[in-house]
From Swiss-Prot:
It is a peripheral membrane protein. It comes from Pseudarthrobacter chlorophenolicus (strain ATCC 700700 / DSM 12829 / CIP 107037 / JCM 12360 / KCTC 9906 / NCIMB 13794 / A6) (Arthrobacter chlorophenolicus). The gene is secA. It is found in: Cell membrane; Cytoplasm. Monomer and homodimer. Part of the essential Sec protein translocation apparatus which comprises SecA, SecYEG and auxiliary proteins SecDF. Other proteins may also be involved. Part of the Sec protein translocase complex. Interacts with the SecYEG preprotein conducting channel. Has a central role in coupling the hydrolysis of ATP to the transfer of proteins into and across the cell membrane, serving as an ATP-driven molecular motor driving the stepwise translocation of polypeptide chains across the membrane. This is Protein translocase subunit SecA. The keyword Cell inner membrane does not apply.
Length: 916
């Protein structure tokens, strides 16, 4: 079925490719005339195109000239001219598609033309990469093209100061990772002042390695969390003891493949007896189920010295891909606390979600979205259903010459790796470069030891030091090079036969102390000569490596996803170069062991000698079946994550939209008057629900009203004016009380001034929304945790989540209105009126208007938590958690924060010496 959908999605390919080809022809027709432009004239083209767009001309019409300008600018600044297929890829991106372009087709350069064209709108363009290194590298390199044409480029990196981030977003084109863009969106929606905002909208995004970011990493939502209120730590310790009494298979089941657990009837009874409760599954006990499941997972699925280590009384996560300790990272959803309880170490405070969004819903906010990858075809249906993105396969610049050999399968890992080493040794001896892909750090280090034992010089890369790895991968095509890498290592960098001239030139200029931004003119003048020298240096070696058969890619194991296998293969045979690929497999590989044990067992028990390789169709089918199972499971997980987040997303959009308008200075007076009317009418409706005036409880109604605002009219006055209780109508009661509330509100406004009242409204509503939204996220987490149990009652958990989530949202909105009204009427405030002040400057001084200052308890921006935890997808589809410590306790209020910074700076300055 999937293949049929993919075929249907691709029926428009020929038509789209014709359109893209026509664009390329139009750009080619302009090339000669653009070559005659001086540098200044080429730069002026940007202003001309921008003016035409402002006058109403569509970007589609400007595309040929804009792309021609970028092609010429790139030739002059980088010595790189866009091929026709790169122009076609760029046009596909501009039209909002995914451009499927094979490895080595120059995707980084492809992005420059559509980025430039869409930056002409002045609304900003975001180019999204898989790691900080690539974001910074691409921003520096391609920024030279943009600056040449009079545009600015920026780069968002982890741990940048907010002021720096704001400056980067203000650039015409901004590079960064998906996690950084997403977290900035969440932080902006936790801001208390518009001066804290860093992003300026979501106009157009180009996502590099789009399959990795929008597919592999989409199972894990972005979460910012802080220390939770209340003491839940005792439950972790309690359940760590409980699970020691439970037995696997008898009391609970464990699914190692899906990494899930399920408690059986016998286990439930034991837990209920231990805790002294009658029913674990009644609503009041719902949170306990999460503690129980985590305790079982900690016991069965998380192994000490494999998944984590204990150092200095602390549980530290071990990266499954690299084997390195991930300092400062913690498992989320209470899992880390459950492991701490199991190990008997100090249980650190659990976190509460402060803001969250899935990557799917973050990227769906962009007005236009596009992406590039070498391998999108297998997920074409998902790209269309989730993101409404079509996949366009762009032809290669030259025909592919790589030979993909059939898999070799061995009975066990030992003989497989022996064969791998023999193959590498033969290729190395004749000088052919070899790239070896492994699925884990453990395997790459094991192979490294075998190679060292045979005296084969090699490099080992483990997808952590991106800058070093990119440089090594770029040179992995040199003669006799042997590079062992985990599958994700160095991704996004081309392997060029004979070496990478561009990397060599960049390294040479860096050695001379030149920086593309700090010494831009000197750098630009030195670049052509440096690049030419580097090209000459690799040219001879390139020819030699071509004659040796090009790059040989050797996979030591099949990945869970066919795409990752194809990405590894795609490192070889770039730009029509010769190349070869082969996978060496064993029947004990994780994929076979977990997902197709039947086929593996039959072959294991066959009479074929251990050291003889099999080329079996049965094995190929088993591998395809296993990969299909994993891909199906992962797709289902992504779909499920999205379904639940869609419920929260509608609520998030409403709240964040309100917050943004308040921060940007919207007048809230009308909204507040609606709050007042709605809240008072709700109280009246409750009090007058039954009977007529003789039956209504006026005493209770007035008690409730007085908690809301200082009522200046009595119940007796209104009853008397109506002519008695029996003649009093609900409408008359509402009219009188609303009139009274308006008069009281007007009097309060007159006492503090209209401008100050508007500021008070803004601060109060913002404060209440922030607090209530965090409480609501906690409620939604709590609801989601126990919603799966509804299936036991033959109810659809998603439908129940939608229904109850909507009820919770309505309750929250009602509470926001009621609390805001109460604060606005009753809060004691201290007001500094608005004033005009003279500020000295070079011209002698100018007048600035200072907004009124309103101070009251609860209206200051809350202190940022001492620790914020950032949970996000890791490169490759896992989960990573980073803990950010705010040791200074810097205020979230800009004015207060500035005072703190000034005090801190003053404390650092040495005291002036007194003159004698």
């Amino acid at each position: 079925m999937a293949s049929l959908i993919e075929k249907l999605l691709r029926t428009g390919d020929k038509k789209t490719l014709r359109q893209l080809r026509n664009y390329a022809d139009s750009i080619n027709a302009l090339e000669d005339s653009f070559k005659t432009f001086t540098d200044a004239e080429l730069r002026e083209e940007t202003d001309r195109l921008r003016e035409r767009h402002q006058d109403g001309e569509k970007l589609d019409n400007l595309l040929p000239e804009a792309f021609a300008a970028v092609r010429e600018a790139s030739s002059r600044t980088l010595g790189m001219r866009h091929f026709d297929v790169q122009l076609m890829g760029g046009a596909a991106l501009h039209l909002g598609n995914i451009a499927e372009m094979k490895t080595g087709e120059g995707k980084t350069l492809v992005a420059t033309a559509p980025a430039y064209l869409n930056a002409l709108t002045g609304k900003g363009v975001h180019v999204v990469t898989v790691n900080d290194y690539l974001a910074e590298y691409q921003s520096d390199l391609m920024g030279r093209v943009y600056r040449f044409l009079g545009l600015t480029s920026g780069c968002i990196l982890a741990n940048q100061d907010p002021a720096v981030r704001r400056e980067q977003y203000a650039a015409d084109i901004t590079y960064g990772t998906n996690n950084e863009f997403g977290f900035d969106y969440l932080r902006d929606n936790m801001a208390w002042d518009r001066n804290e905002l860093v992003q300026r909208g979501h106009n157009f995004a180009i996502v590099d390695e789009v399959d990795s970011i929008l597919i592999d990493e989409a199972r894990t939502p972005l979460i910012i969390s802080g220390p939770a209120q209340g003491d839940t730590n005792r439950w972790y310790s309690e359940f760590a003891k409980v699970v020691l009494r439970l037995q696997p298979e008898k009391d609970y089941e464990v699914d190692e493949k899906k990494r899930t657990v399920g408690v059986l009837e016998g286990g439930i009874e034991k837990v209920e007896d231990y805790l002294g409760i009658s029913n674990l599954y009644e609503s009041a006990n719902t949170p306990l189920i999460g503690f129980l499941n985590n305790a079982i997972k900690a016991k069965e699925l998380f192994k000490r010295d494999k998944d984590y280590v204990i150092m200095d009384g602390e549980v530290l996560i071990v990266d499954e891909h690299t084997g390195r300790i991930l300092a400062g990272r913690r498992y989320n959803e209470g899992m880390h606390q459950a492991i701490e309880a199991k190990e008997g170490v100090e249980i650190k405070a659990e976190n509460q979600t402060l803001a969250t969004v899935t990557l799917q819903n973050y990227f769906r906010m962009y007005g236009k979205l596009s992406g590039m990858t070498g391998t999108a075809e297998t997920e074409a249906a998902e790209f269309m259903s989730t993101y409404k993105l079509g996949v366009v396969a762009i032809p290669t610049n030259r025909d592919m010459q790589r030979i993909d050999q059939s898999d070799l399968v061995f009975k066990n890992e030992t003989v497989k790796f022996d064969a791998v080493v023999r193959d590498i040794a033969e290729r190395h001896e004749k000088g052919q470069p070899v790239l070896v892909g492994t699925t884990s750090v453990e395997k790459s280090e094991y192979l490294s030891r075998l190679l060292a034992k045979d005296g084969i010089r090699h490099e080992v890369l483990n997808a952590k030091n991106h800058a070093r790895e990119a440089a090594i991968v770029a040179q992995a095509g040199r003669k006799a090079a042997v590079t062992v890498a985990t599958n994700m290592a160095g991704r996004g960098t081309d392997i060029m036969l004979g070496g990478n001239a561009e990397f060599t030139a960049v390294a040479e200029l860096a050695k001379r102390g030149l920086d593309p931004e700090e010494n831009s003119e000197e750098y630009e003048s030195a670049w052509p000569a440096a690049l030419e020298a580097a090209k000459q240096a690799v040219k001879d070696e390139h020819e030699e490596v071509l004659n040796l058969g090009g790059l040989y890619v050797l996979g030591t194991e099949r990945h869970e996803s066919r795409r990752i296998d194809n990405q590894l293969r795609g490192r070889s045979g770039r730009q029509g170069d010769p190349g070869e690929s082969r996978f060496y497999l064993s029947l004990t590989d994780d994929l076979m062991r977990l997902f197709n044990s039947g086929a593996a067992e039959r072959l294991m028990n066959s009479s074929v000698p251990d050291d003889v390789a099999l080329e079996s169709k049965l094995v190929s089918r088993a591998i395809a079946s296993a990969q299909g199972q994993v891909e199906g499971r992962n797709a289902e997980q992504r779909k499920n994550v999205l379904k639940y987040d869609d419920v929260l997303n509608r609520q998030r959009e409403a709240i964040y939209s309100d917050r943004r308008r308040i921060l940007e200075g919207d007048d809230l007076h009308e909204k507040v008057q609606f709050f007042v009317e709605d809240t008072i009418m709700a109280l009246i409706d409750d009090a007058t629900a039954g009977g007529n005036g003789d039956d209504w409880d006026f005493h209770q109604l007035w008690t409730n009203l007085k908690t809301l605002y200082p009522v200046s009219v009595s119940a007796d006055d209104i009853i008397e004016e109506a002519g008695g209780k029996s003649r009093l109508t609900v409408e008359f009661l509402k009219e009188e009380l609303l009139s009274d509330a308006r008069l009281v509100y007007q009097a309060r406004e007159e006492s503090i001034g209209s401008e100050s009242m508007r500021e008070l409204e803004r601060r109060v509503v913002l404060s209440v929304i922030g607090r209530k939204w965090q409480e609501h996220l906690y409620e939604m987490d709590y609801l989601k945790e126990g919603i799966g149990l509804r299936a036991m009652a033959q109810r659809d958990p998603l439908v129940e989540y939608q229904r109850e989530g909507f009820t919770l949202f309505q309750s929250m909105m009602e509470a926001i209105r009621e609390e805001s009204v109460g604060f606005l009427f009753n809060l004691e405030v201290e007001v500094t009126p608005a004033q005009d002040v003279v500020v000295e400057d070079a011209a002698g001084g100018h007048t600035e208007h200072v907004e009124p200052q309103v101070r009251a308890a609860g209206l200051e921006a809350p202190e940022k938590p001492a620790q914020l935890q950032y949970t996000a997808p890791s490169e490759g589809g896992g989960t990573q958690t980073r803990v950010e410590t705010r040791s200074t306790g810097r205020s979230g209020n800009p004015a207060k924060a500035a005072e703190q910074d000034a005090a801190k700076d003053a404390a650092k300055r040495p005291a002036k010496k007194k003159r004698r």
